Amino acid sequence: MLLLQITRLMCFHCLLEHGVSPALVPSQPCLGLSTMRKLPSVLARTLTSGTSGSPVLPDMSEGHLPIHVNNVRSRLRDIVGASTNWRDHVQAMQERKALHTLLAKRQEDLPPRRMKDSYLEVILPLGSQPEIREKYLNVHNSVRFGRILEDLDSLGVLICYTHTKQEMQPRSPLSIVTALVDKINLCKKIIYPDCDIKFTGNVSWVGRTSMEVKMHMLQLHDGDYSPVLDATFVMVARDPENKRPAFVNPLVPETPEEEEIIKQGELNKLKRIDFSTASLLKMAPTAEERNIVHDIFLNTLDTRTVSFRSRKLPPNSVWMEDAKLKGLQICHPQERNIFNRIFGGFLMRKAFELGWATACSYGCSRPFIVSVDDIMFQRPVEVGSLLLLSGQVCYTEKNYIQVRVHSEVYDADTREHQTTNIFHFTFISENEVPRVVPKTYGESMLYLDGKRHFAAIMKEI
């Protein structure tokens, strides 16, 4: 039996972005493309098929100069007036309280924005500036996906600040934070460490206090940028003290294509509501799902005894309780965001790395990320928190591994645990993996939830 229950202490080694903007020069040719040829056909087909089901954003690049990736965080600090030194953070947040008077009383008082008003391009010059590769390089000589999650989170916030920018305000009174990662679908398996990367994105839907942001990542090869992933984030605007919702500028379409994108954003909102309403934490499983759970139960009964308690693991299977990894993080000031709480991108990176390790241990081979979906930021993580992470394989099918990572903060004084995030990752392995088998009712609900997420992802790719 493969036992994966391991508790580990993982340290923080995240570098703060220094905000220096080296000159952008043409990219060097991409090297080492032989990796893709070694893939089994099922992996190659799955991870190069592209994403579907979402409208293609119109070209908005004309007249926009790209931003160096190292300048994104520094721009955010300038927009909100954040301190670069931890010892000054209390004073900086006190100064933001005075910005309350700049908040709009009604959304109708704010000027409408177009999609192209928030459009941004960010360059990650891994090919043309080799000195920045070290931060992004993994042991397999490809780009660390966790670092990409950090960059996407920062870019999404900057796009929203661009959408809500008021010309007469030197500092924004809004506190814009990530509320949800709706989905990230990858159409390439390998992100090469020696080819330039370009991120693009803009606001694609607006509520009264929330904004949906669509972002795309492309990588340069043979003189052309080819798609790597599409991402949809949902951001919320709060007051300067991050206590109450704040109104944001409405979004107006200029073309029929943009009208469809806004309609899709509204549909995405309704889908999220429906998915939440049907959650297994609120509603009983469907009749079909109950039959699935009962079949699993019957298949694990020991036929040599007439007992409901005697269970036997089927061939080529792993008990769910033996398919998990755990980790602990001490949240240092180095990992804070512009509002002096722990950076959401950092949380996503750590959760992904634990999820990847869980899938790697389970499948006994290198897994590749296929999709990220439904990451809900339920509460902020304060600096100094003890962050507990638990990665669980909750569903498998052929080469696919569905991993759920649960994140919670632990208060050592009160000994209370509070959930902060739940992450869902879909991986694909080079080989077919054993079937994960739930034993308890709670594990069966995790199994069904993982099955639901996996089915939703398979419709997208």
Residue spans for each PLM region:
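N-terminal chloroplast transit peptides
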Residues: 1-36
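A cross-kingdom feature marking solvent-exposed beta-strand/loop segments within repeated
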Residues: 169-198, 364-388
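Active-site helix/loop of acyl-thioester processing domains in fatty-acid/polyketide metabolism
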Residues: 143-171, 343-367
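Single-stranded nucleic-acid-binding OB-fold domains
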Residues: 141, 145-148, 160-178, 190-192, ...
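Catalytic strand-loop segment that frames the active site of acyl-thioester-processing enzymes
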Residues: 53-144, 251-253, 257-344, 461
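Eukaryotic modular interaction domains in large regulatory/scaffold proteins
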Residues: 324-380
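HotDog/MaoC-like acyl-thioester-processing domains
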Residues: 3-6, 11, 40-101, 190-198, ...
